[in-house]
C-alpha cells in the first residue's frame, strides 16, 4: 500500500494500521465532505489515544507506478466503481513527540480579522 501515492505514503510500509476512507457517490452528493469529517474525527481520536496518525490524501492523486491512487487501492481492496477514495489514515505509535508550538512563534500572516487582509 505504500506505493499507492507519489511521495507521500512511505509511512504506510511500517504503519501498524491504515484506514482507507471511501464514499459512495451514488448515495450522497456530499461524499467528499462526509469522508473529510470522518477523517478529521479519526485523526483527533487517534491523538487523544496517544497514537500517531497521518492523513494521506488519496482523491485526485497519482500512484507511484502511474495511474491514480484510487485505482491502485481499488485493485487491492476490490471496492466498486461507485465508491470513491478520499484519503487514508495511517496509524501507529509515534517515534517522537514534538514539543508544542509557542503561540508567539507562529506566523500570523495567514490570520485575518473581520475581513480578508484585515
Give short role names for the model-derived ranges:
Residues 1-118:
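Acidic, surface-exposed loops and disordered segments
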Amino acid at each position: 500500500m505504500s506505493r499507492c501515492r507519489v511521495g507521500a505514503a512511505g509511512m504506510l510500509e511500517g504503519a501498524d494500521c491504515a484506514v482507507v476512507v471511501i464514499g459512495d457517490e451514488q448515495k450522497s452528493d456530499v461524499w467528499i465532505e462526509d469522508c473529510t469529517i470522518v477523517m478529521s474525527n479519526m485523526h483527533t481520536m487517534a491523538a487523544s489515544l496517544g497514537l500517531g496518525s497521518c492523513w494521506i490524501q488519496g482523491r485526485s492523486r497519482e500512484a507511484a507506478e502511474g495511474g491514480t491512487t484510487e485505482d491502485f487501492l481499488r485493485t487491492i481492496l476490490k471496492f466498486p466503481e461507485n465508491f470513491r477514495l478520499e484519503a487514508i489514515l495511517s496509524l501507529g505509535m509515534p517515534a517522537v513527540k514534538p514539543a508544542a508550538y509557542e503561540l508567539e512563534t507562529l506566523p500570523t500572516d495567514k490570520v485575518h480579522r473581520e475581513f480578508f487582509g484585515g
